[in-house]
Amino acid sequence: MVKTPITDAIAAADTQGRFLSNTELQAVNGRYQRAAASLEAARALTANAQRLIDGAAQAVYQKFPYTTQTSGPNYAADARGKSKCARDIGHYLRIITYSLVAGGTGPLDEYLIAGLNEINDAFELSPSWYIEALKYIKANHGLSGQAANEANTYIDYVINALS
């Protein structure tokens, strides 16, 4: 089961054989109050995913032109390489939407961040490429208000993990 603040609170109370405390109930209530904004953000990111992925890939190519000038399986010098880059950016974005729906970093921790350094090292992928892609997505997702805050929280979480 994916960990979220709600499942963490329940697990802690259950381990101790007690009911949820007022503090834990307030935290759960806060999550429910933010849930609508999180779902709005997840819907918008999903609806605009292809535009965001394409734009993020272009931002990477502009900032790091060698990614399109270097031959090899880990670069975007050809259509196959560009496809892999877009796929990887899409994976990051998809897991961010999962975290928005779950209401916690559990999906990011379990499906993205765990093993990230090993994957990047094994395939010679630069974290700076994905940081640039995520910065593009953050600046261009078109969200505002609480929905933007919710999305940006998870985008920043991944950027920090990559830094």
Swiss-Prot record:
Residues given in the record as (2R,3E)-phycocyanobilin binding sites: C85
Gene Ontology biological-process annotations: photosynthesis
Subcellular location: Cellular thylakoid membrane
Keywords: Antenna complex, Bile pigment, Chromophore, Electron transport, Membrane, Photosynthesis, Phycobilisome, Thylakoid, Transport
Cellular-component GO terms for this entry: phycobilisome; plasma membrane-derived thylakoid membrane
Modification after translation, per record: Contains one covalently linked phycocyanobilin chromophore.
Primary role: Light-harvesting photosynthetic bile pigment-protein from the phycobiliprotein complex (phycobilisome, PBS). Phycocyanin is the major phycobiliprotein in the PBS rod.
UniProt record similarity statement: Belongs to the phycobiliprotein family.
Subunit structure: Heterodimer of an alpha and a beta subunit. Heterodimers further assemble into trimers and the trimers into hexamers.
Name of the protein described by the UniProt record: C-phycocyanin alpha subunit
Gene name of this polypeptide: cpcA
